[in-house]
Amino acid sequence: MTAKYRELDVWTAGMDLVEHCYQLTTSLPRDEQFGMTSQVRRAAVSIPANIAEGSCRKSDPVFRNHISIALGSHAELETYLEIAKR
């Protein structure tokens, strides 16, 4: 049985984003391994994870809450990437 969240384009895009972020963080300085690298990866992983968790819930309000959390994680990730760019 395949989980329905795997059929969501937004989940697939989130998984692609995680892969990209993992590749990107390998180029960060070693002294950022437990700082920026960890934060970027955690924020990225949170996006598809919350989409998957929310889609498996049986309540639309709970699903919307998880989507809201995923959006927050996306904003967090954007901020970390902007900081890393500077």
What are these regions (language model features)?
Residues 1-86:
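Amphipathic alpha-helical assembly/interaction segments
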